[in-house]
Design a protein with these regions (language model features):
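Membrane-proximal juxtamembrane linkers immediately C-terminal to transmembrane helices
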Residues: 9-12, 22-26
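Acidic-histidine catalytic/liganding microenvironments
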Residues: 56-57
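Charged, solvent-exposed interaction patches on well-folded alpha/beta domains
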Residues: 1-7, 11-14, 31-40, 48-51, ...
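Extended, alpha-helix-rich binding/interface surfaces that flank or overlap catalytic cores
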Residues: 18
């Protein structure tokens, strides 16, 4: 009977459920967790899995729950994903502000952002949906005579955007705004008002 109970509970993982990830794929998280061969639930404590995940530079936190009776594992991730690549520093800036040498296929900041604006700039980027961030090809600090906190964005779809720090969260509505102009190409001014100057066809 004792041997039967041990054998019953020492079974392999059947299902792994992952949530909270946008940058990392499910398979990458499974590989980082060292669960790719769906090992025994008994030999892989929740704490051990969490520790493996938190060692990864792109993961800031992880919650792991197991249902050993149904051989299921639930993993919830908080990502430390890349925000942009700094052309000046030649480094990638992560969500937590850390700079790493690795080059990512992400938005490139092409010039220096003044230190007095930098922290707020990072905080604003953290609040933009990662799917919108991935639509930005380049960002340039571009003040004029009137507005100091002004930026120019080159979008992957060919549009240009002028925006100020206080309007940055408007970027989360970017797709809806562009759609309202029948997906035509042009310059979107979010630095003063909200209007769209369509390119000559």
């Amino acid at each position: 009977m004792i041997l039967f109970i041990i054998k019953l509970f020492n079974t392999n993982i059947i299902n792994i459920y992952i949530s909270g990830n946008e940058y990392l794929t499910d398979q990458q998280i499974i590989d980082i967790s060292k669960l790719s061969d769906y090992p025994s639930t008994i030999n892989n404590l929740s704490f051990s899995i969490k520790k493996r995940l938190q060692k990864n530079i792109y993961i800031s936190d992880a919650k792991v729950k197991k249902n050993i009776f149904l051989n299921k594992i639930y993993i919830k991730i908080e990502e430390n994903y890349p925000l942009f690549y700094s052309q000046d520093d030649k480094k990638t800036i992560l969500y937590n502000g850390e700079k790493i040498e690795k080059t990512e296929n992400i938005m490139v900041v092409t010039n220096i952002i003044p230190q007095k604006l930098y922290d707020e700039f990072l905080n604003k980027l953290r609040k933009i949906d990662i799917n919108i961030l991935n639509r930005i090809s380049e960002l340039k600090y571009s003040p004029n005579e009137v507005i100091e906190e002004r930026f120019f964005l080159l979008m992957n779809d060919g549009n240009y955007v002028y925006i100020t720090l206080d309007k940055f969260l408007t970027l989360n509505k970017y797709l809806d705004i562009v759609k309202s102009f029948n997906n035509k190409k042009g310059i979107l001014y979010l630095d003063s008002g909200e209007y769209f100057d369509i390119f000559d066809e």
